[in-house]
Each structure stands twice: as structure tokens, then as C-alpha cells.
Amino acid sequence: LLTDGMVVVGVEYRLSPHVKTMEIVDDAAAAVAWVFDNIGKYGGDTSSIYIAGHSAGGYLVDMVGLDKKLLARYGKDADKLAGIIPFSGQVITHFETRNQRGLKPLQPTIDETAPLYHVRNDCAPILILSGDREKELYGRYEESAYFYRLFKLLGHPDVTLYELGGF
């Protein structure tokens, strides 16, 4: 990718059960803020920052890109992202959060820790990727489709849902 003029930053974050879900989300926000502050040193451009992640990473990029308070803590504006690319990210309250609260694994919940709670029509362009609806983790495609539909209903100008074959 570097030969194509792209800089890729892979980040680490603390894991459950050692920390709560929102601490993990804050780790992701801190990492994105670091990218804004430092990408120029590596040949990157702050106007071309895309955030992407798979599964838990998909959840994290949704939260960081949609809940403006997360990056604002670090003096950054989530609307300055060039794009958000979640792949198979959970958009209801994360199962780990539900587990921490003693809820049943399949009990759907939507609160301030859920990307669905923060859907808005003025965020960065968003490309929602999902695996095959018949093979994807339980309910994940349906969550992604609902997420997409809410963006459309709110009038987001640049949202795409793409279902990958297989998986």
C-alpha cells in the first residue's frame, strides 16, 4: 500500500475482562487522535484518514466515527474523518457490555454504548461491510442492514452496505 501512496496504522487496545468496553472504545479514540497528530510524519494526510476494523474493530470504528464526544476528548473532530469502514461490526450494545451487565447473550440492547444510538446524517462517508447473511455470526448481517437503513432514513448522503459472499 505504501507504494500506492497509502499509510496504514494498526492499533492495539486493552481487552476485556481487564477493562470495560468503553475503556476499550477510548483506547481506539486515543489511537485515532494519535493518527491525526502524527500521520504527517509518515507521509500521510490528515484530510484522508479512513478508519476500518473487523468485528470488534468494526464496532470500535463505528463508535469513534459516530460518537463525536469520543474524539472531542482529544481535541479532534470525528467529522474530519474521510471515511468509516466497519466490517461485521456489532451495532447494538456490544455483547461484552451486555455480559458485563449480566444480560443474556442474545438480549438485544441499544444504549449510548451502541453505534446505532449515535447514527447521524452528517458523519463521514460510511461503507458497511458484512459477510453472507446465511453464514455471518448470528444477527450480524441484520444489524448491519438496519444500521444502513437508519443512515438512509436520516438522509446520510454517502452510505453503502455491501454483503460479501462466503464467510
PLM-predicted stretches and their roles:
Residues 1-10:
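Short amphipathic alpha-helix adjacent to the substrate-entry channel of hydrolases
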Residues 2-3, 37, 121, 153:
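Residues at the C-terminal ends
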Residues 9-11, 87, 162:
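The conserved SAM/SAH-binding core of class I Rossmann-like methyltransferase domains
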Residues 13-17, 91:
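Alpha/beta-hydrolase active-site loop signature
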Residues 16-18, 164-167:
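Histidine-bearing beta->alpha loop at or near hydrolase active sites
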Residues 30-100, 110-111:
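Primarily recognizes the serine-hydrolase "nucleophile elbow" in alpha/beta-hydrolase
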Residues 75-97, 106-145, 149, 153:
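The feature captures the conserved acid-bearing segment of alpha/beta-hydrolase catalytic domains
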Residues 148-166:
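Catalytic histidine neighborhood in serine/cysteine hydrolases
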